[in-house]
Structure formats: C-alpha cells, structure tokens
C-alpha cells in the first residue's frame, strides 16, 4: 500500500470533504465545528470529523472511498485523529459495525454527555444505532 497522508483539513476547505462525500453518494456532511481529518493519496480517500463535547469528543462522518476499504485506512485515520485529542471519544454506529470499532479499542457505552444522549435518542427513532466510546487511556495502548 502506498504511503498515505493522514492530516487535518482546515475548516476553510470543508467544502472539499463535503464534495468527497457527495461524489460517493453519501449523505454525510463535514462538521462545521471541530477538527476535520482526511486520508489522502493525491486526493481525499477518507474523512471524518471530531467535535468537542463536554469533556471529550464526538467522532462523526467516517467514510472511506469504496476501493480503499479493507486496507486499514479507516483505522489509521481514526488513530491519527485520536492521538491529537485528550479525553474520551464517542461515536454512534449501526450495531453491525461494533466489531470493527472494538478492534480499535472502542466499547459499547450507555454513559454519554447529555447532549449526545439526547441526539442518540432522537436518531434512534429512525435507525438502529449504538453508542461506543474510548477513553484516553485506551487510546494510548
């Protein structure tokens, strides 16, 4: 696999990440707040957003270009992003993705900041989602 560039994307370039999502038929949108992270092989091949919430961060918008899936890009992008932040990180995902995230150190949680608990309750009305989290200590293992 070629050397990929994992780095932050300035908010001023957020439209590039939104364009990447749209080009692959994803309804995801890059967060207007927080850090945007991308993996590049020339152009963007994966992206995610990390938004500060309470004493930690909320990971959203993880998407990898289909031809790059199964090659470790998502895990490496997450690892690079989480290495730069202190405190716990949470995400919501479909239950089928639980194993993928558990391999990265995340675990199922029901303890969420109230703002995220409210979002999860609202989102869960229309789709099947679970909450996962990772502590600062687990990020460093």
Identify the residue ranges that each predicted region occupies.
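Conserved active-site alpha-helix within GNAT-family acetyltransferase domains
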Residues: 95-122
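Short amphipathic alpha-helix that is part of the acyltransferase structural core
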Residues: 1-31, 36-38, 112, 127-141
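Conserved acetyl-CoA-binding loop-helix of GNAT-fold acetyltransferases
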Residues: 64, 70-83
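Acidic/histidine-enriched, beta-strand-rich ligand/metal-binding domains
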Residues: 60-61, 67-69, 103
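Conserved beta-strand in the GNAT
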Residues: 38, 43-52, 56-63
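Conserved GNAT acetyl-CoA-binding A-motif
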Residues: 83-96
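Hydrophobic, well-ordered beta-alpha structural blocks that scaffold small-molecule cofactor pockets
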Residues: 46-49, 75-80, 100-103
């Amino acid at each position: 696999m070629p050397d990929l560039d994992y780095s932050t994307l300035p908010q001023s370039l957020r439209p590039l990440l939104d364009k990447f999502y749209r080009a692959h038929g994803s309804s995801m949108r890059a967060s207007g707040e927080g850090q945007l992270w991308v993996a590049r092989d020339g152009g963007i091949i994966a992206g995610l957003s990390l938004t500060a919430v309470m004493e930690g961060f909320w990971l959203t918008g993880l998407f990898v270009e289909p031809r790059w899936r199964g090659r470790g890009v998502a895990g490496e992008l997450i690892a690079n992003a989480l290495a730069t932040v202190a405190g716990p990180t949470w995400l919501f995902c479909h239950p089928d993705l639980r194993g993928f995230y558990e391999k990265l150190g995340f675990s199922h949680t029901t303890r969420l900041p109230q703002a995220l608990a409210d979002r999860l309750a609202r989102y869960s009305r229309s789709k099947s989602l679970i909450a996962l989290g990772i502590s600062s200590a687990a990020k460093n293992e």
